[in-house]
A protein has these predicted regions:
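Negatively charged
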Residues: 1-8, 20, 24-172
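Short acidic, low-complexity intrinsically disordered linear motifs used
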Residues: 12, 16-20
């Protein structure tokens, strides 16, 4: 038999076979936006440190940067499952000496479903303007000043569920 014949044979693909016990439901493993289920960062602090290093090493223009070699490149592909605190994550990401922007990358695939606090996350990150509408922010309670000073940010957030929010002050 050829490989094509084997792959089209239903008995070689258990998922195509009828269930032996149709009353038993099979629950698939949790799926996140980024496709990861195992946390990459054991603590919020380690995650924040890695982000700061990624920015300071200018990894957005240097795929060979050290932190990119450690956690992968680009930053938008990092597994953020389990992170609960993103306060001040990209705050002030501008080089005030040269006025060069240090961060404006796509992080739309990050799993933020466990995040509770996004306070000041993009505070004075003046060039950040990436789509975030598909983020699951339903667990976030603090959005205070999240985009305050992020003068370029102009993306829709109409799909966000902010029903858990206790602070939305100065969000923009």
């Amino acid at each position: 038999r050829t490989a094509i014949q084997e792959s089209s044979d239903p008995s070689s693909n258990p998922s195509s076979l009828p269930s032996i016990n149709p009353s038993v439901a099979v629950t698939p493993a949790p799926v996140t936006l980024s496709g990861c289920t195992n946390p990459m960062f054991p603590t919020n602090e380690e995650f924040k440190k890695a982000v700061k290093e990624y920015i300071s090493q200018e990894c957005s223009t240097n795929s060979g940067c050290a932190i990119g070699q450690t956690y992968g490149y680009p930053i938008g592909k990092w597994c953020t499952t389990g992170i609960t605190d993103m306060r001040f994550l990209f705050a002030g990401t501008e080089n005030f000496m040269s006025r060069d922007v240090l961060f404006d990358e796509d992080i739309s695939e990050w799993d933020v479903s466990s995040v509770l606090n996004m306070e000041f996350m993009f505070y004075y990150a003046p060039s950040f303007n990436q789509p975030l509408n598909n983020w699951d922010v339903s667990s976030v309670s603090n959005f205070g000043a999240m985009f305050n000073g992020a003068s370029s940010f102009n993306q829709p957030l109409n799909d966000w569920d902010v029903s858990s929010a206790t602070s939305l002050g100065s969000m923009f």
